[in-house]
Amino acid sequence: LSKYWKIPPDGCAAFVVCMEDVLDVYHAPYDPQFPLVCMDESNKQLVGEVHAPLPLAPGCGQIIDHEYVRNGVADIFLEVEPLRGRRHVEITEQRTRKDWAMFVKGMLDERYPQAIKVRLVMDNLNTHSAASLYEAFEP
């Protein structure tokens, strides 16, 4: 059995500061007026079958050919509220600053209208910034 940890690079104080901020957020108790929401996104290739899979035989799995046809890509937005055990997923055709801003707006307007402030934990992807919100909406 192994345990995995994110080991900061030597001399990277900025990394340690950010990591400690996130760990502090995760240790805070649940508060519905200040929910903790983790958000991420990923693009996925959409593939189709070139040859129909062979039907299942008793005791055997389905046989699927390795050849596939590419049907484009989609972007998956995931929002998780770990202290409540709640999640929400949306799929878009692309990954733009506006798509991210619209996802955040939907989260705030539709799923957390009662919150005073949402504590949002996310990575440093170029679209995940306040600038994206300014580009999508009037300040």
Give each language-model segment a name:
Residues 125-139:
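Helix-centered, glycine/charged polyanion-binding patches within enzymatic domains
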Residues 3, 48-51, 132-134:
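Short aromatic-enriched loop/helix-cap "lid" or pocket-rim segments at secondary-structure transitions
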Residues 2-6, 76, 118:
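Short hydrophobic/aromatic beta-strand element in the GNAT-like acyltransferase core
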